[in-house]
Design a protein with these regions (language model features):
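Short, charge-rich amphipathic interface segments used for partner binding and complex assembly
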Residues: 11-63
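Short, charged, low-complexity loops and linkers
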Residues: 1-5
């Protein structure tokens, strides 16, 4: 994966994480435990994807 592709993907994922954080806040404000759990799982998934992109970029750079 090229550096620019990785950077673009991470930027997109950051936007998704920020939007997910807003959904988590909304779920907390409304007391919706189910929505809170769903959005927290989504956020964890997005963060894991960022980690995978970083590892792929570092591996490609080392090769």
């Amino acid at each position: 994966m090229s550096k620019s592709n990785a950077s673009a993907e991470i930027s997109g994922l950051q936007i998704c994480i920020v939007n997910t954080d807003a959904q988590i806040d909304a779920a907390l404000d409304s007391g919706d435990r189910r929505a809170f759990r769903v959005w927290c799982l989504r956020r964890a998934s997005l963060i894991a994807r960022v980690e995978r992109v970083l590892v792929e970029a570092a591996t490609a750079k080392a090769a």
